[in-house]
Structures are given as structure tokens and as C-alpha cells.
Amino acid sequence: MLSMEDVKENTGFVEAHTFEEKGFRYAEAGSGPTIVVLHGLFGALSNFRSLFEHFSPHYRVVIPTLPLYTMPALKTNVKALSDFLHDFMQFKGLENVNLVGNSLGGHVALLYTSEHREKVNSMTLTASSGLYENSLGGTFPKRGNYDFIKKKVALTFYDPVHATKDLVDETFRIVNNNQHALRILHLAKSAIRHNMAKELPKMNVPTCLIWGRNDTITPPEVAEEFQNLLPKADLYWLDECGHAPMMEHPDKFNSTLSKWLSRMFIR
């Protein structure tokens, strides 16, 4: 998905609620229980536009920009992103948060929760890395080939219509920036090293798994393994859906998460 730091957003309500202060860039709206949303490796704030608008009337929704391309290259890893999240939470004074993470963002949520369980009320993982991921970021054998990148981006979705020209153009630009590509490779390798399988059984936190049945990047068996290893996990499937459920089926995603949060926290 598009880089939050490198693409000019034009997302109406989201853009109007985006702030920059003390070195952090984030979107925030609403009041009530706090939902903190974590984007993925190619993730953009705009990926969560529908979630932001849907939940902000009843929840405080906060979406920080993760510093994917601004950390020192050799220190660009999942642990550093978890530490960044901790610093952001401290800065905002956030407690008892409900983390929502897509892809790499889910992995960051897992690592953060394993280290700061007292700060986390619940987790929602959608197409999360942490166990296995067949990622675009793993290698760039043909990164200068536009058609190759176009096909890779299309694999993110069940319906390739979602792989818009803007999305492909931005991904192509990111992977052909040497400094960005280097950091993506470091993050992809870090995600493999930081396998969470041994930690998951200890994470006694209510967890909602929302997964696309047609996800080829973190396939359905990954969701099933998460459900088996996490003590308090509920798994929900979205049909005809790939690696970005909140983009491909935003209404179904929001409805599923809303019902789960209502059942868990009586809202």
C-alpha cells in the first residue's frame, strides 16, 4: 500500500484530523475507548479511511505514522517500531488501548503487547505477519520492471481492480528508491527473525482475527495458527478477500470489528 510518509493524502475527514507534533505524525478523532491503528509495510493512513470514519463517532481512533523510511537503516526492525509505538503512546498518554494492526502493523501490535501487556485492552489482527508472510518486501528481483510490480501489487487483493494505477505507481516509486528499498529489506528480514510463535501462548489478551479467505501473502493457515496459539482469539473470515480486508471489504470489516468490540466490551 502507499507510504504514509511519501504520498500526499487527499482523504477528506482523515486529512482534516491529521496532526504533526514533537516528531510524530498521526490522525486522531473521536472520544471514548481508544483504538490505535497500525499500518503495514506499504501502508497508508488512507487505507483506514473507512475505519476512521466508522469508529470515531463512538471511539477515540488514533493512527500513527510508523517511521518505516526514517530510522537508521541498520536499526530498522520490528523491535524499533514497537519501541516507537511505546514512545508515541507515552507522548499521547494512551492507556488500555485496543490495537488494530494490518500486515506488519499486526506484527508490531504483537511485539508491543508481549512487552507492555498492561497497556493493551485487546488486539485485532488482520493479515498479520509474525508467523509467516510471503511478502513483496522479501526481495526485489525485478524492481525496475513496472509490470512486475503491478502484478505483485495486484496479488495483495482478491479483485485486482483495487490495485489502482496510483497504488502501483507509488509502490514502484518506493521500491526503486534505494534508501527505501534497503529499509524494506531490513524490515522484511526482521519480521522473519521476530517469529512470535513461542510468545503467543503467553499473550492472554482478547484478540479478534479478521482474515481474507483468499489472502496469498498471509494465507488462511496462518490465521488458523494464530487462533490455535493465542489463548483468547476469535477468527472471522471475509470471502473473496485478499491481504487488505479493510480496503477490499471495508463495510464487512468494520461491521465484524464493531460487533466483536461490542460483545467484548459491551458498547
Where are these regions (language model features)?
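Alpha/beta-hydrolase fold catalytic core
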Residues: 1-35, 57-59, 73, 95, ...
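Active-site loop/oxyanion-hole signature of alpha/beta-hydrolase fold enzymes
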Residues: 19, 27, 49-50, 62-100, ...
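Conserved HGGG/HGGXW glycine-rich cap/lid loop of the alpha/beta-hydrolase fold
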Residues: 25-71
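Conserved hydrolase catalytic core segment
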Residues: 95-132
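Conserved alpha/beta-hydrolase catalytic His-Asp/Glu region
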Residues: 143-202
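Short beta-strand/loop motif that positions the catalytic acidic residue
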Residues: 203, 209-211
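Acidic catalytic loop of the alpha/beta-hydrolase fold
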Residues: 214-218
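Catalytic active-site module of serine/aspartate enzymes centered on a nucleophile-bearing elbow/loop
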Residues: 234-267
